């Protein structure tokens, strides 16, 4: 069973922050062989979604930014390698979408999706809104989820 927590940067404990940075680095830097700095200075402005086991092991994570001006964004979506294949990514994204819709019901939601996950995000209701582009030498595409008014 996964325990979901929404925390501001200030609410993250040292242990939680360490687990978040460790998970993001293990996937975005090591696994994806992407030698770019993950800590981008934006975490203090974000809401942080942590999905953990009862033993406080972090299995998945995403961060959300408030609308600016009319579009919220979800990013740094990550699932631990050991936790993939059981629908956790869909649960994580649904938690993030629900959070955005509850807090900012009129806002659209943007993501910068890695191209190989395009179908995954489309099944969640995201639509392509940009041409493909490279971000840190990884193919991405802009996608958007429209607000339900």
Named regions from a protein language model:
Residues 79, 85-98:
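Conserved acetyl-CoA-binding loop-helix of GNAT-fold acetyltransferases
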Residues 66-75, 84, 105-107, 137-139:
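A conserved beta-turn-beta hairpin within the catalytic core of GNAT-like acetyltransferases
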Residues 93, 100-113:
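Conserved GNAT acetyl-CoA-binding A-motif
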Residues 50, 57-65, 70-78:
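Conserved beta-strand in the GNAT
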